[in-house]
Each structure stands twice: as structure tokens, then as C-alpha cells.
């Protein structure tokens, strides 16, 4: 056998060897020993890691014992002889990707902020650690307060590169309105505590009502909030005081210069600029007016403002000063071929339009009413120092006639610098009148009359022939 092995080693196929049948039993025993060693080796490592006394063993076994090494050396190089390696018992946690926020490690011996390897660094688009703002140590992991603070700071503190917040200012206002005080909703009729078995809300008096009005947080973002009855009543009383204190004559205008046939269209045209306090039937019947022109406050609808009108003029009182200024811009417009005038109301202008004396009174005549109002319903006013007061005397009815409608041309209240004044131009035209006209026309007429008289005195045949042929007298 030794001679055969020497010859084989001398040949070029040095890696090929013939295993004798006697060495097959030894080879099987060698495999069994290797399997037993592989099973025993991890248990020894586990005991060493857990603290049991054991002989120090290397993690990677390089060579088997010396008894087997001689036998293994006889095996060729291509024989399956893997290296024995130890499987570590400790599991290392690895991050699959870069996290948005730093992860706090559970082990106390490993520092939380280990930036040597480049992981857990604050990079673009990541949040900052809230413990930096609160000065919390990285090893302080057992306190619940720090976790609460960090969660609050994570929602409040924002980075310039992160996504927009999930909560808005409106949500914070709603939360403040809900949790501000428990006595805010005492007078709310929708609450179950304020509703009895009969279904009627019970009013619970609150001793802190004046304090609640000042300290209550008003939620301007909530559309379902309603004003309390106390605030509504105070607003209504304030509105009534304003209506009583305002002088509606300052918002009044006078429209003049239109014929009575287009009186309704004139009123409807000026009703588009604002709410009119006079109760005109034309405005009631007109269904296409905007809802803004309708009266909303009950105090103004109950009060019927008197109507002052005459032949070709009417007084309109607006609810706001803005509507009056818009209506005054319509001064000088032409409607249906007529020039319309619009001026601010004043007692002097009204007196000039109606040509009334101080003792006479202004009559209320509705343009569309067929029956005249009774004298009891009329409110009589007398002009005393520019203010109308109630007269104690009996009502005296008088009609405004066309002859009394006189407006002086020199009155300053009706003058407009943009308005054209048309003068009398009848003297420019030649008319057959008996009066002697001055100027060129009068001289021409006088010469013609003299020629006629001279021609009549001469009754020769030549003159008669000329008159018959040419007809000079007909000129």
C-alpha cells in the first residue's frame, strides 16, 4: 500500500486517492465524532456567555484535535471539510432605513446619541429631538412626564422643512371655547340639563352672569353660535335709540321736473339706490326688488313715514346717507325725454316747490291711491325756525294747483353748474307782429312798408304790368 501511495503521489493526479476498504470504517467513525463535536460546541459557548465556568474556547475552530488531524491530513483537498464556526447568541438590532426621528435605545449601557457612525443625525426633513429643548438626559427613560412633554413638543415645535400641521387655529379656538368654563352653557336651551320632562327649557339664574359676559371666550370661528337673549335685547334697544335719535330729514331728497305720467317709474328708479321709508304702493307691488331694499327692523316697518308730493315733485327719505349720496348723482338725467332734477331736502326748497305760506300745511297725497286720507290720520306740521312741530290747530286741507307751482329762477338751491340755461330766442325769427322790432329786422320791415306805400301811389300801366308778371307785391 505504501508503494502504491508513493507512486500516486509522484503522478500528476496528486489530489486523487484510492480509499481502501479497511479505512472506510475509520472514515465513518471520524464523521460521527465530527457531528458530536459540532453539537457539543454551541452548548459550551452558551454556558460561557451565561456566566458558567468553562474553559475559554475560540469562536472559530481552526483545526480539530491532534488525534484526528493526522487522519484529516490523509483526505484530499476536494473532500468536504467545512470550517467550524460559532453562532453568536446576542441579536443586533439594525435599522432598515433612515428614520425621521431619533430612536431611543432600550439598553442603558449603550448611549442614545451615538453619532460616530453617522446614524440618528438631524438631517434634512427630520424633526428635532424634543429633549433638546427640555434639557432631558438621554438615559432618563423611565419618567412618564418626560414622555408627555416630548409628545406635546413634537406637535407644537415645528421645523421649517417638515409637513404642515394637522391642527389649525380654528381647532384650538374650538377647544378653548369648549373647555374654557363650565358655566358658559348654562342658558343653552339645547342642553339636556336645561330641558324638563314637558319639553320646555328651564332658565337657571346664574349669580356670575356679569362676570361671565366679560370673561367668556367668544368663539368667532364657530358658525353655530347664537347670541343670548340678553345681548339680543340690548342690541334691539340700541337700534331703537339710534332710530329715535337720527334725523331722517337729513337723508331725504326732492325729485322734480317730471310729468305725472312717469311718476311711478321715477319712484322705482330711485328705489334701486336704497331703502325708502315712505310707504309707496308702487314699491310694494313691484316684486322684482332686491331683498336688501325690504325693511328688516320692526320699529321702522311699524312707523309709516308721511309722503310729501305735489304736481311734478316728490320727497323721498332714504335709510342711509350712502343711498342719498348715490341718488343725488342722478341730478340732470333725462328719462323719457324729460330732464329730472334731484336735490337735497330742505324746508326752504319744499316751500318754494309748493309755494306755501307759513300758516299753510303740506298735504299728504299718494300717487296711486284713489281715496283721500282722513284729517285724523294726517300728522300736521308747522315750520318754526326750520323744524317741523305738531300743530294744535285743526287740519286745513288744500290742494296744490298748477298755478301755485312756481319756482324762482334765481334760487340757489336749484342751480347746477353743469346744467344749461335756455334763453328766449324768439326775437331772432321774423314774425308778422304789429310791434316795432329793433335792429336789422325792424329796418328791413320799415323799408318794405315804405316801398309798398310808394308803389300804391304810382298806378301806371308799367307798374301794373310788372306786378302782374313778377308779382312783387306777393313778396
From Swiss-Prot:
Residues 7-17, 92-104 have a biased composition (Polar residues). The modification N-acetylalanine is found at residue 2. The keyword DNA repair does not apply. Gene3D superfamilies: 3.30.70.330. Present with 2060 molecules/cell in log phase SD medium. Contains FG repeats. FG repeats are interaction sites for karyopherins (importins, exportins) and form probably an affinity gradient, guiding the transport proteins unidirectionally with their cargo through the NPC. FG repeat regions are highly flexible and lack ordered secondary structure. The overall conservation of FG repeats regarding exact sequence, spacing, and repeat unit length is limited. FG repeat types and their physico-chemical environment change across the NPC from the nucleoplasmic to the cytoplasmic side. The RRM Nup35-type domain might be involved in the control of mitosis. Functions as a component of the nuclear pore complex (NPC). NPC components, collectively referred to as nucleoporins (NUPs), can play the role of both NPC structural components and of docking or interaction partners for transiently associated nuclear transport factors. Active directional transport is assured by both, a Phe-Gly (FG) repeat affinity gradient for these transport factors across the NPC and a transport cofactor concentration gradient across the nuclear envelope (GSP1 and GSP2 GTPases associated predominantly with GTP in the nucleus, with GDP in the cytoplasm). This is Nucleoporin NUP53. It comes from Saccharomyces cerevisiae (strain ATCC 204508 / S288c).
Amino acid at each position: 500500500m505504501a508503494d502504491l501511495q508513493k507512486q500516486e503521489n509522484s503522478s500528476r493526479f496528486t489530489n486523487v486517492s484510492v480509499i481502501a476498504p479497511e479505512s472506510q470504517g475509520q472514515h465513518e467513525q471520524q464523521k460521527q465524532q465530527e457531528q458530536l463535536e459540532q453539537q457539543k460546541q454551541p452548548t459550551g459557548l452558551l454556558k460561557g456567555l451565561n456566566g458558567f465556568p468553562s474553559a475559554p474556547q475560540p469562536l472559530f475552530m481552526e483545526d480539530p484535535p491532534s488525534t484526528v488531524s493526522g487522519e484529516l491530513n490523509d483526505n484530499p483537498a476536494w473532500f468536504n471539510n467545512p470550517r467550524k464556526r460559532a453562532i453568536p447568541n446576542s441579536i443586533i438590532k439594525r435599522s432598515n432605513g433612515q428614520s425621521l426621528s431619533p430612536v431611543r435605545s432600550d439598553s442603558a449601557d449603550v448611549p442614545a446619541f451615538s453619532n460616530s457612525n453617522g446614524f440618528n443625525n438631524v438631517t434634512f426633513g427630520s424633526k428635532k429631538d424634543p429633549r433638546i429643548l427640555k434639557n432631558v438626559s438621554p438615559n432618563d427613560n423611565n419618567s412618564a412626564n418626560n414622555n408627555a412633554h416630548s409628545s406635546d413638543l413634537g406637535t407644537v415645535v415645528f421645523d421649517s422643512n417638515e409637513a404642515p400641521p394637522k391642527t389649525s387655529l380654528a381647532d384650538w379656538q374650538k377647544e378653548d371655547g369648549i373647555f374654557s368654563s363650565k358655566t358658559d352653557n348654562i342658558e343653552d336651551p339645547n342642553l339636556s340639563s336645561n330641558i324638563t320632562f314637558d319639553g320646555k327649557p328651564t332658565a337657571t339664574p346664574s349669580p356670575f352672569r356679569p362676570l361671565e359676559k366679560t370673561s367668556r371666550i367668544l368663539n368667532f370661528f364657530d358658525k353655530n353660535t347664537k347670541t343670548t337673549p340678553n345681548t339680543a335685547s340690548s342690541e334691539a334697544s340700541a337700534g331703537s335709540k339710534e332710530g329715535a335719535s337720527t334725523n331722517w330729514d337729513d337723508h331725504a331728497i326732492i325729485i322734480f321736473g317730471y310729468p305725472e305720467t312717469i311718476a311711478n317709474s321715477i319712484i322705482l328708479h330711485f328705489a334701486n339706490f336704497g331703502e325708502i321709508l315712505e310707504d309707496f304702493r308702487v314699491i310694494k307691488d313691484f316684486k322684482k326688488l332686491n331683498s336688501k331694499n325690504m325693511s328688516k327692523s320692526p320699529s321702522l316697518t311699524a312707523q309709516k313715514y308721511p309722503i310729501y308730493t305735489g304736481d311734478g315733485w316728490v320727497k323721498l327719505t332714504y335709510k342711509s346717507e350712502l343711498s342719498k349720496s348715490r341718488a343725488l348723482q342722478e341730478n340732470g338725467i333725462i328719462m323719457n325725454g324729460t330732464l329730472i332734477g334731484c336735490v337735497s331736502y330742505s324746508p326752504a326748497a319744499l316751500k318754494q316747490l309748493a309755494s306755501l305760506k307759513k300758516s299753510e300745511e303740506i298735504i299728504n297725497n299718494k300717487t296711486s291711491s284713489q281715496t283721500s286720507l282722513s284729517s285724523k290720520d294726517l300728522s300736521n306740521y308747522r315750520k318754526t325756525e326750520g323744524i317741523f312741530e305738531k300743530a294744535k290747530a285743526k287740519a286745513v286741507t288744500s290742494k296744490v294747483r298748477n298755478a301755485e307751482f312756481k319756482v324762482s329762477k334765481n334760487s340757489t338751491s336749484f342751480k347746477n353748474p353743469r346744467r344749461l340755461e335756455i334763453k328766449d330766442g324768439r326775437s331772432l325769427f321774423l314774425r308778422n307782429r304789429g310791434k316795432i322790432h329793433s335792429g336789422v329786422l325792424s329796418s328791413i320791415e320799415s323799408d318794405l312798408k315804405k316801398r309798398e306805400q310808394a308803389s300804391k301811389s304810382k298806378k301806371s300801366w308799367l307798374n301794373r304790368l310788372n306786378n302782374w308778371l313778377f308779382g312783387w307785391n306777393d313778396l
